[in-house]
């Protein structure tokens, strides 16, 4: 489910979407998390572990992929609140991907459908 909210520098769409985060290192470790919000600057994730600022990651949400790098990762309320600046988006064809596309429509760079 996605709700609109306006705060900070960019307006945000609140979200509650399952995501898989893959570290784009030689070991390509992955961790499950939740997309908490989406904005022009990127996405905010709730994760069980810390990611390093500057680390390259791939996010898998439904059948869509978002590529970017970690902007911050801070401990808050029993989890790490992690910001990812998104550089590229590849959208899938599922209903959830269409919902994601509507949230990303005017905020993300290079949104592509598969």
Regions found by a protein language model. Name each.
Residues 24-26, 40-41, 73-78:
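Short, conserved beta-turn/loop elements at beta-strand boundaries and strand-helix junctions
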Residues 10-11, 46-50, 73:
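Short, surface-exposed secondary-structure edge patches
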Residues 1-38, 88-114:
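N-terminal helix initiation/capping motif
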Residues 50, 63-66:
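Short, charged beta-turn/beta-strand-edge "cap" motif at the junction between a beta-strand
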Residues 31-33, 67-73:
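Short beta-strand-centered aromatic/proline hotspots
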Residues 43-47, 76-87:
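Short, solvent-exposed secondary-structure boundary/capping segments
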């Amino acid at each position: 489910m996605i709700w609109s909210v306006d705060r900070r520098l960019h307006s945000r769409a609140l979200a509650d979407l399952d995501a898989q985060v893959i570290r784009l290192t030689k070991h390509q470790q992955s961790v499950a998390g939740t997309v908490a919000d989406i904005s022009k600057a990127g996405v905010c994730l709730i994760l069980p572990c810390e990611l390093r600022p500057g680390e390259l990651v791939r996010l898998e949400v439904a059948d869509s992929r978002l590529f970017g790098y970690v902007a911050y990762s801070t401990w808050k309320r029993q989890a790490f609140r992690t910001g990812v600046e998104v550089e590229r988006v590849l959208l899938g064809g599922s209903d959830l991907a269409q919902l994601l596309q509507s949230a990303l429509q005017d905020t993300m760079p290079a949104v592509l459908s598969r």
